[in-house]
Amino acid sequence: LIPQILPGSADEFRLLTDAVGGKGYRQIDINLGCPFPMIAGKHKGAGMLLYPAQVAEVLAPIAEYPEIQFSLKMRLGWENASECMVLVELLNTLRLSRIALHARTGKQQYKGHPDLEAFQGFYELCQHPLYYNGDIESLSDIRQILTRFPLLKGVFIGRGLLSSPLLAKEFKGNETFLPEQRMSISVSYTHLRA
C-alpha cells in the first residue's frame, strides 16, 4: 500500500508527509492528476499543472525527506497537453522513484482519447522511470502501449480493471480469456469469497 497525498502548498505537503510518514510509510505518491473540478479549482491535482511556479514550490520539500521515496501521478496538463512539457525539466531535477502520466488533460477528465503524441514528447525527455496511464482496458491495449513506448517501466491499469477484472491476470499469463473462461474464473472467485 502506497498512500497518496494531494497538496496545494509546500506547507500542506509537509503536513501531509509528516502525517503519513508518522504512520511508518516510506513511500508516498503525489497526486497532480486528479481532474475533478472541486479539486482542480483549488489549484490541486491536475488543476495545479497550469501553474509551474506553484508546482515547483509544492514539490520543493521532497528534498527535506530523504527517508521517503516519492512518486508522482500526473496528467499532460489541465487545459492543453503542452503543459507537461513546461514541467519536465523541473521534474527531472527532483528525487522521484517514478512518474505515472495519464495521457489526457484534466479538462478532458476521462472523455475523448488519450493523446499519445503528447505522451511521446514527455516520454522522450523524462529521466525518471515512467508509467503510462489512460484507457488500458485489454491485453491488446497493454501490448500496443509497451510496443510503442518500449522504455516504459509499465502501465497503470486503474479503471480498466472495472471493465475487465481479469486484465492483470491476462497480462501476467500473456493470454486473453474467452468469455466462458472469464465466467468460470469469476464463479470460482465468488465461491472463494463466500
Q: Which sequence ranges carry the predicted segments?
A:
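Glycine-rich, positively charged N-terminal anion/phosphate-binding segment
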Residues: 1-23
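Active-site-adjacent beta->alpha loops and helix N-cap segments on the catalytic face
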Residues: 37-58, 108-119
